[in-house]
Amino acid sequence: MARSLVHDTVFYCLSVYQVKISPTPQLGAASSAEGHVGQGAPGLMGNMNPEGGVNHENGMNRDGGMIPEGGGGNQEPRQQPQPPPEEPAQAAMEGPQPENMQPRTRRTKFTLLQVEELESVFRHTQYPDVPTRRELAENLGVTEDKVRVWFKNKRARCRRHQRELMLANELRADPDDCVYIVVD
């Protein structure tokens, strides 16, 4: 008779580790430890811990809850007082953004006069050249890029409108234009 072993991948034996719990977290304790390689505060590299966000250094899980001593598996976690919400990890998230991320630009709301001017040029040509765009941008008081994007979006709206008209004309058939075939 073959015997099968069931392996629970979620179970972690936490009683093996000695957890030192201090009432206040110490900033820079990990980076000041001798033999530490790397820089920055711990936990800023994302969830690289395969043990479900358990941090054995300060006895806290990734949600800010305390790790219970020993046990695991199906045991209910003991309720421990939660740290105040303004922790260094939260302050680090609100800090300066990475250099490669550009701030999101706000949507430009053109005035009625600006839209009228853009529409009049659009009726003349849907693809204005660079000098025309520059002059138009200077007259309107916006950047050339904003003008270029406006023309690009306007062309897309016109194409969509043309497609809608074509579909509407296909659906609306004139009974006089239809051919009826009667089969006996």
Swiss-Prot record:
<dbReference type="GO" id="GO:1990837">
    <property type="term" value="F:sequence-specific double-stranded DNA binding"/>
</dbReference>
<dbReference type="GO" id="GO:0006355">
    <property type="term" value="P:regulation of DNA-templated transcription"/>
</dbReference>
<dbReference type="GO" id="GO:0005829">
    <property type="term" value="C:cytosol"/>
</dbReference>
<dbReference type="InterPro" id="IPR050649">
    <property type="entry name" value="Paired_Homeobox_TFs"/>
</dbReference>
<dbReference type="Pfam" id="PF00046">
    <property type="entry name" value="Homeodomain"/>
</dbReference>
<comment type="function">
    <text>Transcription factor maybe involved in reproductive processes. Modulates expression of target genes encoding proteins involved in processes relevant to spermatogenesis.</text>
</comment>
<dbReference type="GO" id="GO:0010628">
    <property type="term" value="P:positive regulation of gene expression"/>
</dbReference>
<feature type="compositionally biased region" description="Low complexity">
    <location>
        <begin position="88"/>
        <end position="99"/>
    </location>
</feature>
<feature type="DNA-binding region" description="Homeobox">
    <location>
        <begin position="103"/>
        <end position="162"/>
    </location>
</feature>
<dbReference type="InterPro" id="IPR000047">
    <property type="entry name" value="HTH_motif"/>
</dbReference>
<dbReference type="GO" id="GO:0003677">
    <property type="term" value="F:DNA binding"/>
</dbReference>
<dbReference type="GO" id="GO:0006357">
    <property type="term" value="P:regulation of transcription by RNA polymerase II"/>
</dbReference>
<dbReference type="GO" id="GO:0005654">
    <property type="term" value="C:nucleoplasm"/>
</dbReference>
<dbReference type="GO" id="GO:0000981">
    <property type="term" value="F:DNA-binding transcription factor activity, RNA polymerase II-specific"/>
</dbReference>
<keyword id="KW-0805">Transcription regulation</keyword>
<keyword id="KW-0371">Homeobox</keyword>
<protein>
    <recommendedName>
        <fullName>Rhox homeobox family member 1</fullName>
    </recommendedName>
</protein>
<dbReference type="GO" id="GO:0000785">
    <property type="term" value="C:chromatin"/>
</dbReference>
<dbReference type="GO" id="GO:0005634">
    <property type="term" value="C:nucleus"/>
</dbReference>
<dbReference type="GO" id="GO:0000977">
    <property type="term" value="F:RNA polymerase II transcription regulatory region sequence-specific DNA binding"/>
</dbReference>
<dbReference type="InterPro" id="IPR001356">
    <property type="entry name" value="HD"/>
</dbReference>
<dbReference type="GO" id="GO:0030521">
    <property type="term" value="P:androgen receptor signaling pathway"/>
</dbReference>
<keyword id="KW-0238">DNA-binding</keyword>
<dbReference type="InterPro" id="IPR009057">
    <property type="entry name" value="Homeodomain-like_sf"/>
</dbReference>
<dbReference type="GO" id="GO:0003700">
    <property type="term" value="F:DNA-binding transcription factor activity"/>
</dbReference>
<feature type="region of interest" description="Disordered">
    <location>
        <begin position="26"/>
        <end position="104"/>
    </location>
</feature>
<feature type="short sequence motif" description="Nuclear localization signal">
    <location>
        <begin position="155"/>
        <end position="164"/>
    </location>
</feature>
<dbReference type="InterPro" id="IPR017970">
    <property type="entry name" value="Homeobox_CS"/>
</dbReference>
<keyword id="KW-0539">Nucleus</keyword>
<comment type="similarity">
    <text>Belongs to the paired-like homeobox family. PEPP subfamily.</text>
</comment>
<comment type="subunit">
    <text>Does not interact with itself.</text>
</comment>
<keyword id="KW-0804">Transcription</keyword>
